[in-house]
């Protein structure tokens, strides 16, 4: 059976792509067929006649099924701005039903499908829908990435509230230590655990830029426990 996960974050730049790639790389090395998808990407450069985005490139690099780089993204725009604005500039309508079909097509090609959102939970993707609406339509468990920067407690609390209100299942959260220059780091992380109601399923360390392998083993067991079917 294929397991699918939707990765969102507290904001842009919190480390969603890095977390996706860490999970793909580790579980792919365990013999699983894995693919990372970025249905919507904004901020792309034109190279050799094709739009290329750094996040899309990394997700493709860490996927191990036979696909082309452009296959992992359904909508890509050159402008580095909110997708509803980028799509309007390019006269392209982003349709969530089309994205759902795009994602579902990969379920027959891999054991694990990781879908990376764009920006945060309430980023508009068209005139009527936000990232959260796409996640609801996909109806797959959500992983929330939280970076340990100033303001993360407020960001985490608001995003958690919105995720739970949407009715999707929160599979777990990831602490991404993007900096080691934070006042009272231990107290901040303890506060995050209190807000989230659990310890993170993964902690990405600033110095090592990788998670503890033992955490990946726990994550693998959680993913394949089928507890969220």
Name what the model sees in each region.
Residues 126-149:
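Inter-motif core of Ras-like GTPase G domains
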Residues 14-15:
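Conserved glycine(s) of the Walker
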Residues 4, 18-93, 97, 102-104:
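N-terminal phosphate/diphosphate-binding loop that engages ATP/GTP or pyrophosphate donors
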Residues 161-229:
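C-terminal lobe/tail of nucleotide-utilizing enzymes
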Residues 7-8:
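Hydrophobic anchor at the beta1->P-loop junction of P-loop NTPases
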Residues 99, 103-126:
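Switch II (G3) loop of P-loop NTPases
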Residues 127-133, 157-160, 185-190:
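Charged helix-capping and loop-helix junction motifs
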């Amino acid at each position: 059976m294929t397991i699918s996960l939707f990765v969102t974050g507290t904001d842009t730049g919190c480390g969603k792509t890095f977390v996706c790639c860490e999970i793909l790389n580790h579980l792919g090395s365990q013999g699983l067929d894995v693919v990372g998808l970025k249905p919507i990407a904004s901020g792309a450069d034109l190279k050799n006649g094709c739009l290329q985005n750094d996040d899309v490139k990394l997700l493709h690099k860490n996927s191990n099924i036979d696909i082309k780089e452009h296959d992992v993204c359904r909508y890509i725009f050159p402008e580095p701005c909110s997708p509803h604005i980028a799509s309007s500039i390019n006269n392209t309508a982003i349709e969530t039903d089309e994205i759902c079909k795009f994602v579902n097509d990969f379920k027959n090609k891999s054991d694990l499908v990781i879908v990376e959102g764009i920006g945060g939970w309430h980023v508009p993707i068209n005139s009527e829908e936000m990232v959260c609406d796409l996640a609801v339509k996909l109806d797959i468990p959500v992983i929330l990435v939280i970076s340990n920067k100033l303001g993360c407690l407020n960001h985490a609390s608001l995003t958690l509230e919105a995720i739970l209100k949407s009715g999707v299942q929160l599979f777990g959260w990831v602490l991404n230590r993007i900096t080691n220059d934070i006042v009272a780091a231990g107290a901040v992380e303890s506060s995050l655990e209190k807000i989230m109601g659990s310890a993170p399923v993964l902690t990405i360390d600033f110095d090592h830029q990788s998670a503890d392998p033992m955490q990946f083993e726990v994550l693998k067991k959680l993913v394949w426990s089928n507890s969220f079917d």
